[in-house]
């Protein structure tokens, strides 16, 4: 029997709520092969308050990008529901009450920008569905480009900008509708360290100015810890630990979280180094029995191989799925 979300994860005052959300993909093997089910997201709940920032961290293939797409309506859940201010979230692109209220920033800004549109037109495009006049769209786009440090460049095209500048354009486009929520899917992973820092500072500044809530997705705990006060750790479709950022960095409880911390640059973490993660992520088509992390866990015992751990509460807003925590 699945544990219910803790009160601090689900509340009536949540801006964006994911309630026991799962997403299953049917995978066929060859032209006449059997169809198999891939559970990309497995019974995940979260509560994102107005103006808050939640970090979602895990290795590539753990399901975090799928969860991000569920959160903004690009995918529909196979089970559970996504609510915005208590109302079911309609599909992205629908001409509805929720249009423009949740936006997404992708990992590759170049592929998310139309090369045939000037960046001013690309930034202004989301306003067209709201009936904003062309002149007003242009004025708002120029103002938003100035906000992200690209004032006076609206007539240029994406290929004329560096990777960091293109990500600034993507930030401007995401903010043009004054969204309540911005889902940031690995927005700095393709950038070098100095440009990463500039982009993260920009995201913090625009949050202070415009107040959107962030669901920030990354494989890098150091990046997530810079921007987010609450962190959720995902492994093979499940959340295995979540905690306030300070508590997590002071003493992560799950061996997987500890291994992610060990992969951080030395200056980014506190305390003693922890054994690095070994082995490959198992296939989500055939997840291990019991605790899904047990094949890679240095602390695994027999019960870990037999039974899936339930949530264990460790403090306010802090819980973990681990028999040894």
Predicted feature locations:
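ABC ATPase NBD coupling module
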Residues: 31-35, 88-103, 121, 129, ...
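Helix-to-loop junction immediately C-terminal to a conserved catalytic motif
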Residues: 72
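Conserved ABC ATPase "signature" region
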Residues: 128, 135-152, 205, 261-262
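Conserved ABC ATPase signature
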Residues: 157-161, 165
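A short, proline-enriched helix->beta-strand linker immediately N-terminal to the Walker B motif
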Residues: 176-180
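P-loop NTP-binding/switch modules centered on Walker-like glycine-rich loops
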Residues: 183, 191, 195-272
